[in-house]
Regions:
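N-terminal basic, Ser/Thr-rich segments that initiate or prime the first beta/alpha elements at protein or domain
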Residues: 1-444
């Protein structure tokens, strides 16, 4: 290729269009200076009170007259100097007032893109994009965009990540979604009331507070101890109810769609092929109703909840969608450790179980809160046999399988000879599974 040919090719490329965030963004960023002052005041409450007592009304008004415009100017300038653009290969974000910073997010490294709307953002009609990128511990985000623009940008980024040409990616639009199920608010509320954490805190309060009153006869002492206990009990139920309200699960070509939230609305996507482990969690008080909770380990993503509560039959059908070709082993198929294992883990050894099928490595643990972990053979990165001195004396061992999401699933307290055979067999199943696995794709 000649130099002139390269120059002509560069000139023929469409110019990169830089865009700004939504105009309400300065209101969000203007809070930064105010937050610094509030943080200082909370950190040194006595010093802040002394400073306030020295201020006259005139001085306070002058200070507010300077602070508010300064904060507004900071918010405006930070918004004005923030741009983003989508190129052929990356999402480019430029920020900074004095020191310019440019973030280059490679499209092929994007694992998932979520659209979230906090309460005030819903009122203003804006949203923010959260991007799960390989190699980062936290999500990158663009905040804020118009709600429609956020969804359009998400669709464009996913289309480009899937390999669509840049000139057609913006025309692809958001992939259609088919609703699979919706968790009724009443079912969610009952399930949260039946979780162990709520009742543990209530039981602690019921026992500790009367004892505290008997010992001190001080109402303030009882309130000081009781309010945090009741607050913890409420937070474990009310907080989760607000976050998991109207949980809706849908299916689309780019993965499973999850919409949820009473105040802060979130729209998340579980990308296909990235699920490393699926867990079916069954608290004690849920068993009579046949409910389970479905959790995930997803490589490159912090999303970990697929279903907050669902009947077991429905949950198993959803698992079959997440892990095609996988059937959840029934409880009777899970083999317990031998009785001699009770010397290693008294009582709780009965909660362990193992089943290995052609598709998954399944391990169970827990008596009061059962958890069944399913790992597809193709997702196993390594296999380890662990045997401590006490286990060696009792002739048992643990077999650990490690996944790509930095997770580990263990088959506890297996007979030593069985564990050695399982170690070799699982390594071979993993190699075969990775060889025969279909490639991970964003879109069909």
């Amino acid at each position: 290729v000649t130099t002139s040919g390269v120059q002509e090719d560069v000139h023929d490329r469409p110019p990169m269009t830089e865009r700004r965030l939504h105009p309400v963004t300065p209101l969000r960023r203007a809070w930064a200076p105010v937050a610094v002052l509030m943080g200082w005041a909370v950190h040194d409450l006595d010093g802040a009170q002394r400073q306030l007592t020295r201020l006259t009304t005139t001085t306070l008004l002058i200070g507010l007259g300077v602070l508010i415009p300064a904060a507004a100017l900071y918010g405006f300038l930070s918004w004005w100097f923030t741009h983003f653009a989508v190129t052929d290969s990356e999402l480019r974000v430029r920020t900074g007032l004095l020191f310019r910073r440019t973030a280059h997010i490679r499209l092929e490294r994007i694992q998932a893109i979520d659209v979230t709307q906090p309460l005030l953002a819903r009122v203003a009609g804006v949203a923010k994009l959260k991007l799960d990128v390989i190699g980062t511990d936290k999500k990158d985000e663009l905040a804020f965009l118009g709600a429609g623009e956020a969804r359009a940008l998400r669709a464009e980024l996913l289309a480009r990540a899937a390999g669509f040409a840049p000139e057609t990616a913006h025309e692809v639009g958001e992939a259609p979604s088919r609703q699979m199920l919706r968790v009724p608010p009443g079912v969610l509320a009952v399930s949260l009331l039946l979780t162990g954490a709520t009742w543990v805190w209530l039981l602690v309060a019921a026992v500790a507070l009367p004892l505290l009153w008997t010992a001190t006869h001080s109402l303030w002492t009882v309130l000081a101890a009781g309010v945090p206990m009741l607050g913890a009990a409420g937070a474990s139920s009310v907080g989760r109810f607000v976050a998991e309200y109207d949980w809706t699960l849908g299916e689309s070509p780019d993965g499973l769609r999850i919409d949820h939230g009473l105040l802060d609305r979130a729209h998340e996507t579980v990308p296909p092929g990235r699920v490393q482990t699926v867990r079916l969690v069954e608290p004690l008080l849920w068993r009579r109703r046949g409910w389970v909770r479905v959790e995930l380990d997803v490589a490159g993503s912090s999303n970990s909840l697929l279903l907050p509560v669902a009947p077991r039959e429905i949950a198993e059908s959803v698992v079959a969608r997440v892990l095609p070709g996988v059937t959840v082993p029934p409880p009777e198929a899970l083999v317990r450790p031998p009785r001699r294992a009770h010397w290693c883990v008294p009582v709780w050894w009965r909660g362990y179980g193992l089943a290995v099928t052609d598709a998954v490595f399944a391990a169970r643990h827990g008596l009061l809160r059962r958890s069944l972990s399913l790992v597809p053979h193709a997702k196993v990165q390594s296999v380890r046999l662990v045997q401590g001195p006490w286990q060696r004396a009792r002739g048992v061992a643990d077999v650990h399988v490690d996944t790509g999401a930095n997770g580990t699933v263990a088959a506890r307290l297996r007979p030593a000879d069985e564990a050695a055979v399982l170690l070799r067999a699982q390594a071979e199943r993993s190699r075969t599974g990775r060889r025969d696995a279909l490639p991970d794709r964003w879109m069909a």
